[in-house]
């Protein structure tokens, strides 16, 4: 039985003061015992969040890490070893905003995945299609390519210690959400692609849906057989809304 996971991606939001307020709200949440919960603040606030959530059953992750595992001469980047030292347990890899706006290639994403894993972090591999790709009927082809690039580089066994998040790009920050049936179709295809290489790995890997996840739609999405939780964006900046999504995963 796969344990649900709800992870909040705070993106490029927050000040020292607003993060303190959000931590206070998160500490007051009654969270379901059967769900893993994590938040991913901007790097600047990771230590503040780790300290502020000490003793609360909420993990802390990062939104990005470097292609090299150890610290060194790579100006502006954060090594996964540094993130682990700061108290992070997981890290997003290949988020669509980084692929599309910053030009991260499948090769770079694979390198970041491997570097993170080598430092004991759980990579959360983000895959998903644009609106144009969906309208062209290429959704499954695009997702298979993004997933396959990591399988080809690192082997399917790497996914025994990883999470995959399907995030339809057209639904991120737009208020649009893939229907439960649309999301399930892609999640089933992801699991089938992994199962073609290793059935046990496919059975155990957690697949998250990310794309304007809200409390109102969460329960129906999480009720799908291959959706094991959510990668939550804007809604994770509101403690009460985020808590409601976590409870939906526990139901």
Curated annotation (Swiss-Prot):
It is found in: Cytoplasm. The lineage of its organism: Bacteria, Pseudomonadati, Pseudomonadota, Gammaproteobacteria, Pseudomonadales. The active site is at residues 95, 167. GO terms for cellular component: cytosol. Keywords: Cytoplasm, Gluconeogenesis, Glycolysis, Isomerase. It catalyses: D-glyceraldehyde 3-phosphate = dihydroxyacetone phosphate. Its main location: cytoplasm. InterPro entries: Aldolase_TIM (IPR013785), TIM_sf (IPR035990), TrioseP_Isoase_bac/euk (IPR022896), Triosephosphate_isomerase (IPR000652), Triosephosphate_isomerase_AS (IPR020861). It is an enzyme of class 5 (isomerase). Pathway: Carbohydrate biosynthesis; gluconeogenesis; Carbohydrate degradation; glycolysis; D-glyceraldehyde 3-phosphate from glycerone phosphate: step 1/1. Substrate binds at residues 9-11, 173, 212, 233-234. The gene is tpiA. Belongs to the triosephosphate isomerase family. One of its GO terms (biological process) is glycolytic process. Involved in the gluconeogenesis. Catalyzes stereospecifically the conversion of dihydroxyacetone phosphate (DHAP) to D-glyceraldehyde-3-phosphate (G3P). Homodimer. This is Triosephosphate isomerase. Its EC number is 5.3.1.1. It comes from Pseudomonas paraeruginosa (strain DSM 24068 / PA7) (Pseudomonas aeruginosa (strain PA7)). GO terms for molecular function: triose-phosphate isomerase activity.
């Amino acid at each position: 039985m796969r344990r649900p996971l709800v992870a909040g991606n705070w993106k490029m939001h927050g000040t020292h003061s607003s993060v303190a307020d959000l931590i206070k709200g998160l500490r007051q949440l009654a969270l379901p015992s059967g769900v893993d919960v994590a938040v991913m603040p901007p790097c600047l606030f990771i230590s503040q969040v780790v300290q502020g959530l000490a003793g609360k059953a909420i993990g802390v992750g990062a939104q990005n890490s470097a292609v090299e595992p150890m610290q060194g001469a790579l100006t502006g980047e954060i090594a996964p070893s540094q993130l682990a030292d700061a108290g992070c347990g997981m890290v997003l890899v290949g988020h669509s905003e980084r692929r599309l706006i910053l030009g991260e290639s499948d090769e770079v994403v694979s390198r970041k995945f491997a570097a993170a894993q080598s430092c004991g972090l759980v990579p959360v591999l983000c895959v998903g299609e644009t609106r144009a790709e969906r309208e062209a009927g290429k959704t499954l082809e695009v997702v298979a390519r993004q997933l396959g690039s990591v399988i080809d580089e690192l082997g399917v066994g790497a996914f025994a210690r990883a999470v995959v998040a399907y995030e339809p790009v057209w639904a991120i920050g737009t208020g649009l959400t893939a229907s439960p049936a649309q999301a399930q179709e892609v999640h089933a295809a992801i699991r089938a692609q992994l199962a073609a290489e290793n059935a046990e790995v496919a059975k155990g890997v957690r697949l998250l849906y990310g794309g304007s996840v809200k409390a109102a739609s969460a329960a129906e999405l999480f009720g799908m057989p291959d959706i094991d939780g959510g990668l939550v964006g804007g809604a994770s900046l509101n403690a009460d809304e985020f808590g409601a999504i976590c409870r939906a995963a526990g139901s």
